[in-house]
From Swiss-Prot:
Native source species: Stutzerimonas stutzeri (strain A1501) (Pseudomonas stutzeri)
Lineage of origin: Bacteria, Pseudomonadati, Pseudomonadota, Gammaproteobacteria, Pseudomonadales
Any one GO molecular function term: rRNA binding
GO terms for cellular component: ribonucleoprotein complex; ribosome
GO BP terms: translation
Cell membrane keyword on record: no
Name of the protein: Large ribosomal subunit protein bL9
PANTHER family: 50S RIBOSOMAL PROTEIN L9
Length: 148
């Protein structure tokens, strides 16, 4: 199935690219999410007419992500959790907890934007947490977990 991408999609292409995808991926994900449109002659003409508008919207999204990244880079967030001896937490700190702490400190962050490649945090200490704000913009936040 040939589609025209309406935004940049990781491992697939950039705005305006005409790509071949499996029919299920196109029908069930890209088209309903508004990330692509079928590559018919009418849609191609409509896309070319709207191209400047879509590129401007994509540039605005990236600019807002960069300003959020600059705000996040300056942040140092402390989360208090109950812990036993030797700093082992009762429970864990996940992406939702980190996103809530960042939002409370003034920068709106969704839990899907927080990246924890090693899984949830289960020890007290200092951690560098990656926040993926845009396909091209990633910020690192210093997270301090203390026993409370």
């Amino acid at each position: 199935m040939e589609v025209i991408l309406l935004e940049k999609i990781a491992n697939l292409g950039n705005l305006g690219d005409k790509v071949n995808v499996k029919a299920g991926y196109g029908r069930n994900y890209l088209l309903p999410q508004g990330k692509a449109t079928a590559a018919t002659p009418a849609n191609i003409a409509e896309f070319e007419a709207r191209r400047a508008e879509l590129e401007k919207a994509a540039a605005e999204k990236k600019a807002s992500a960069e300003t959020r990244a600059a705000q996040l880079a300056e942040l140092e967030v402390t989360i208090t959790a109950t812990a036993g001896d030797e700093g082992k937490l009762f429970g864990s700190i996940g992406t939702a907890d980190i996103a809530d702490a960042l939002t409370a400190s003034g920068v709106e962050v969704a839990k899907s934007e927080v990246r924890l490649p090693n899984g949830t945090i289960r020890q007290t200490g200092e951690y560098d947490v990656a926040v993926h704000l845009h396909t091209d913009v990633e910020a690192t936040v210093k997270l301090i977990v203390v026993a409370g």
